[in-house]
């Protein structure tokens, strides 16, 4: 058995030996990552002077996610026309130490030109997008791509849509033609349509498909992968980390001391809050376990019990709280890491089905779990608004028109709503479905059922 196979097997066995199913070790690891990140900022190891300058602050989507000076992407294209060198983006090193990834935020209306300056100057061929334009009624990313029969113009750049296809239920692939000073280039964009902010997808399958497809489109030529979500940290960090580990597997360069903790820690030195929440950190472990499991099955056919041994790791250690259950689309077996089996997707979370009801005076998040409603339960209130079905602001252009949408090169920030505080995304309070409902106080008469003897 090769040394590479031994290292892969050792990592999987280590997960079981350390009893990751309890989750305590992963929680401690992620707390350590956050603590070190805070220390780096306070000690000046990771400075943000450029992004904090007066002329650049309105180019940051979120006030607390600012590009690190040491690894920030510096724009030189079109500087002679008065455009600055700052964009909220950082380089992340690949397995060979090169600038393999550009982690950036979703463009703002007044940074669309800067985004396309970045794509053109650094020869980006593939863009991975892990968010939607609008999520939960809030604008997360300005549309920087063209629609069918609707070209987009950003300064001197003209973008047209060549082709749009749906790879599966989660991923849309667009091929764009970008024109700048009479030169044409093709840029591919992969958009993951259903990854919740601060959360995780319902399975690893389509994430692995997205990363694999990106590498097929990228080919062996130069140029970094451009990866973004809304802030360019949480979901972006997961994608970069998954591709990084996958490259280690494909090149058989897993180091003897391989550690996902160290992988994420190193990425956080290059991009703020990469892999932003503990849930995303668990999902990363879950996905990497699937990658390692598949690799070991391909290279060691006699290790038949691996899948059974790793099933608890995938099912329990990395229990994923998601906002929706999406069916996984199986892919035909082929080369290494092309078909990854994952646990069945979880059922819809209670928060998406029932209204938030909290008993007065009870601590948030207490109780063993929700009580399922029965057919005999009497509704207490006449109208309940499900939490997951918030109104969504539709800001897209009308269909059926063919026009160039011109984006001004410079534009002031759109106001306070352009910024949002980015937290760790953890649930600070439970829903308390198991709690009984007390009598409502007020002028309303209680339901008749309460007065029956």
Swiss-Prot record:
It catalyses: O-phospho-L-tyrosyl-[protein] + H2O = L-tyrosyl-[protein] + phosphate. Highest expression in bone marrow. Also expressed in kidney, lung, ovary, spleen, thymus and lymph node. It is an enzyme of class 3 (hydrolase). Its EC number is 3.1.3.48. Residues 26-291 form the Tyrosine-protein phosphatase domain. Interacts with PSTPIP1. May be involved in growth and differentiation of hematopoietic cells. This is Tyrosine-protein phosphatase non-receptor type 18.
């Amino acid at each position: 058995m090769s040394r590479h196979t031994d290292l892969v097997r050792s990592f999987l066995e280590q997960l079981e030996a350390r009893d990751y199913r309890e989750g305590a070790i992963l929680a401690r690891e992620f707390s350590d990552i956050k603590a070190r990140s805070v220390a780096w900022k306070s000690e000046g190891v990771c400075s943000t002077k450029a992004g904090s300058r007066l002329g650049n602050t309105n180019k940051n989507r979120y006030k607390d996610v600012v590009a690190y000076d040491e690894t920030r992407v510096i724009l030189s294209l079109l500087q002679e026309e008065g455009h600055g060198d700052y964009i909220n983006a950082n380089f992340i090193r690949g397995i060979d130490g090169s600038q393999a990834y550009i982690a950036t935020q979703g463009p703002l209306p007044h940074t669309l030109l800067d985004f396309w300056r970045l794509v053109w100057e650094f020869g980006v061929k593939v863009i991975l997008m892990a968010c939607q334009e609008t999520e939960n009624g809030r604008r997360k990313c300005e549309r920087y791509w063209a629609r069918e029969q609707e070209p987009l113009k950003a300064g001197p750049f003209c973008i047209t849509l060549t082709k749009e296809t749906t790879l599966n239920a989660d991923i849309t692939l667009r091929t764009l033609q970008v024109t700048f000073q009479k030169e044409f280039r093709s840029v591919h964009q992969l958009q993951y349509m259903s990854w919740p902010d601060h959360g995780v997808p319902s399975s690893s399958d389509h994430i692995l498909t997205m990363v694999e497809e990106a590498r097929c489109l990228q080919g062996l030529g130069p140029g970094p992968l451009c990866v973004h979500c809304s802030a360019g940290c949480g979901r972006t960090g997961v994608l970069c980390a998954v591709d990084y580990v996958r490259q280690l597997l494909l090149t058989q360069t897993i180091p003897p001391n391989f550690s996902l903790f160290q992988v994420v820690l190193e990425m956080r030195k290059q991009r703020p809050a990469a892999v932003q929440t503990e849930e995303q950190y668990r999902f990363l472990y879950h996905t990497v376990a699937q990658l390692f499991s598949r690799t070991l099955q391909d290279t060691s056919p006699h290790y038949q019990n691996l899948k059974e041994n790793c099933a608890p790791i995938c099912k329990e250690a990395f229990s994923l709280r998601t906002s929706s259950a999406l069916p996984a689309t199986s892919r035909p077996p082929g080369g290494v890491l092309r078909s990854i089996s994952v646990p069945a997707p979880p059922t819809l979370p209670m928060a998406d089905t029932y209204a938030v009801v909290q008993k007065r005076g009870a601590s948030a998040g207490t109780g063993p779990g929700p009580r399922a409603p029965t057919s005999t339960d009497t509704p207490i209130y006449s109208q309940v608004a499900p939490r997951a079905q918030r109104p969504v602001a539709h800001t897209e252009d009308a269909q059926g028109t063919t026009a160039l949408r011109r984006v001004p090169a410079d534009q002031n920030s759109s106001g306070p709503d352009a910024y949002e505080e980015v937290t760790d995304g953890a649930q600070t309070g439970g829903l308390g479905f198991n709690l009984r409902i007390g009598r409502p106080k007020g002028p309303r008469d209680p339901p008749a059922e309460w007065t029956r003897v």
